[in-house]
């Protein structure tokens, strides 16, 4: 595999994920145990009807099918929805050992075509060892897609990511937007919106496993997919074979009032701080055509002063959403650039233009239908899990504290999302990840990740205990394996998937 190919596949899916929610991030009345859920699934599984995949972006060896699952697992005999899946058979059937499921991030915004391109970048020994299977999670893409019909202004990344509306950090405008967006979901989202959450996604994954006729499942989950993979390991521990969790999210629900999603948002505070020194070092290098300052120490005040100025005096930006370059758009653009160091030049160009009172050409937005679908899936996944705070005073206090401690993110990670006004009762609290079950997990984690900071990955590592080994990679950006990691980390993951050999203990890849 060449780095160029893997980068292209990764960037394609990253751009869509960023538009929807970035990586960052989720019901049942019966006990969430493997005993209650795995055996009946296996008995009811129907053989899949594989056909040629329709549409562009699929390889010639690729097959597509649909797995029928309950819309509501509390009513398993009720209405069904179809989960779109795709398969690329092992390139060497004589050594095939099972299925490797690619679990996408988001949540929301991925597509079967993009995940398929990612599968084709895997090293030869992995492509030989497994049938590679990808899927669109419920409500997403080809799997009964949902939409809230958000207003145009609410499709901006600075709207879904709740940057404080006013330059003083007031949350009042965000709560108004939350009510407007939640109302759109209630009017337009349909019944499925109430049944999109991480536990339902995990049960869908087990339905896919059963429909494939596999006793156990191997998987590679990235970003939100790392959390979904951890939940699957918790609910179906004896169905797991080799699991790779990549760019790991903080799954410590106890620290966030029973809600993993609030912790995922909060992770941006530390994640952006972790990456900024690398950006500052790059942006102060002599000879850099996008140099922002003479020293790395000067880059931070340059950025903060400019963001504050744009809060007060935004620059018109025709064609952009929103149609101005304000302080929050600048902050959001920097955060997006931090997902991949190759994005540093774009962020620096924007900063240089804004300092002169100008803007570059507006980036072309993704198709509106894709945005609407991704945002609706992300909203439901987050909001259906746990009861979110609704108090303006609580949000204001947390935002004020965050702005003081983490000025680069200006309070956004602690602000009110549309979940503060979500019209439906929560399905359940987040699943508590434990160390109970077989040792089948290899975690791979970049040291500097804006959306999945190392501190959060360590929380997940501690929760998994003896079930996991973690490889920490001396690298910057989101997506470690075959993305923004390094050769040492890539080799460790490939070796585990192909041979089952994991490092004996937690490892640091320089």
Where are these regions (language model features)?
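Short linear, low-complexity motifs centered on an aromatic residue
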Residues: 1, 351-355, 399-404
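Secretory targeting and sorting signals
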Residues: 1-38, 67, 205
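Gly/Pro-rich cap/lid or specificity-loop segments adjacent to the active site
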Residues: 40-329, 380-510
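Generic hydrophobic alpha-helical segments
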Residues: 350-351, 493
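Long, low-complexity segments enriched in small/aliphatic residues
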Residues: 351-386, 390-393
């Amino acid at each position: 595999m060449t780095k160029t190919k893997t980068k292209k596949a990764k960037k394609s899916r990253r751009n869509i994920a960023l538009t929807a929610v970035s990586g960052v991030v989720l019901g049942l009345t019966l006990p969430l145990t493997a005993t209650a859920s795995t055996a009946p699934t296996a008995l009811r599984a129907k053989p899949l009807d594989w056909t040629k995949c329709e549409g562009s972006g699929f390889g010639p060896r690729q097959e597509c099918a649909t797995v029928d699952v309950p819309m509501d697992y509390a009513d398993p005999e009720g209405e069904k929805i179809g989960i779109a899946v795709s398969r690329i058979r092992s390139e060497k059937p004589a050594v095939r050992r099972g299925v490797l499921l690619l679990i996408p991030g988001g949540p929301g915004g991925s597509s079967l075509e993009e995940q398929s391109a990612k599968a084709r970048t895997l090293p030869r020994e992995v492509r030989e060892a497994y049938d590679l299977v990808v899927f669109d999670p419920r409500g997403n893409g080809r799997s009964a897609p949902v939409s809230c019909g958000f207003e145009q202004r609410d499709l901006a990344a600075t709207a879904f990511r709740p940057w404080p509306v006013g330059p003083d950090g007031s949350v009042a405008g965000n709560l108004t937007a939350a009510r407007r967006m939640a109302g759109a979901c209630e009017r337009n989202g349909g019944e499925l919106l109430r049944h999109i959450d991480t536990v339902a996604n995990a049960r869908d994954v087990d339905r896919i496993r059963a429909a494939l006729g596999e006793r156990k499942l191997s998987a590679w989950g990235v970003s939100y997919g790392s959390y979904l993979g951890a939940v699957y390991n918790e609910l179906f521990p004896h169905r797991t074979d080799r699991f790779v969790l990549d760019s790991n999210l903080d799954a410590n629900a106890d620290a966030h009032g029973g809600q993993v999603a609030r912790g995922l948002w909060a992770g941006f505070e530390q994640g952006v701080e972790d990456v900024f020194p690398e950006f500052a070092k790059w942006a102060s290098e002599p000879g850099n055509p996008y140099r922002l300052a003479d020293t790395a120490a000067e880059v931070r005040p340059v950025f903060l002063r400019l963001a504050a100025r744009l809060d007060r005096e935004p620059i018109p930006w025709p064609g952009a959403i929103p149609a101005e370059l304000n302080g929050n758009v600048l902050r959001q653009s920097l955060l997006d650039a931090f997902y991949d160091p190759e994005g540093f030049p774009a962020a620096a160009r924007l900063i240089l233009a804004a300092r002169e009172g100008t803007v570059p050409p507006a980036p072309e937005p993704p198709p509106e239908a894709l945005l609407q679908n991704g945002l609706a899936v992300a909203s439901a996944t987050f909001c259906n899990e746990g009861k979110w705070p609704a108090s303006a005073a609580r949000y204001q206090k947390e935002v004020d504290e965050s702005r003081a401690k983490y000025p680069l993110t200006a309070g956004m990670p602690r602000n009110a999302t549309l979940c503060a006004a979500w019209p439906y009762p929560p399905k359940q609290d987040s699943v508590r990840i434990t160390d109970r079950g077989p040792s089948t997990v290899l975690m791979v984690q970049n040291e500097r990740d804006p959306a999945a900071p190392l501190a959060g990955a360590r929380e997940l590592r501690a929760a998994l205990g003896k079930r996991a080994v973690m490889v920490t990679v001396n690298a910057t950006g989101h997506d470690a394996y075959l993305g923004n990691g390094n050769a040492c980390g890539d080799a460790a993951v490939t070796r585990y998937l192909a041979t089952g050999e994991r490092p004996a203990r937690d490892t640091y890849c320089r």
